[in-house]
Curated annotation (Swiss-Prot):
Alphabetical list of InterPro entries matching this protein: PRR15 (IPR028237)
Organism per entry: Danio rerio
Pfam families, alphabetized: ATAD4
Family assignment from sequence similarity: Belongs to the PRR15 family.
Name this protein carries in UniProt: Proline-rich protein 15-like protein B
């Protein structure tokens, strides 16, 4: 008789051979790490600054126009533009003509 759990095989995820790299370690830091003569505090702060810069450049533009709802779906943020009625200072000529139309 066939294996009763054959359907479980359809939901298995394929294992990836390599893990995703979340950050990059600069190559000169790994070379300097072998030398024990360096001041570790200065090297650590230098590495931290570089890692922060890498993360900031990669994640700065991702997901700014998208928000995640409670259900986990992505929703696009829409920019609300100000109308001319709310900001008459943008076009003073049109505001004056509107006032004259209202008065007549």
């Amino acid at each position: 008789m066939a294996d009763p759990a054959w359907w479980k095989l359809t939901f298995l995820k394929k294992k990836k051979s390599e893990a995703k790299v979340l950050y990059e370690i600069p190559p000169d830091f790994s070379n300097n790490n072998a030398n024990k003569d360096l001041d570790h505090d200065a090297a650590d702060s230098n590495l931290d600054a570089r890692l922060e810069k890498i993360v900031a450049t990669k994640s700065a533009t991702k997901g700014r126009h998208v928000k995640v709802s409670h259900s986990g779906r992505f929703k696009e943020k829409k920019k609300i533009r100000a109308t001319l009625v709310e900001n008459p200072s943008l076009f003073p000529e049109s505001a004056q003509t509107e006032k004259s139309h209202v008065e007549q």
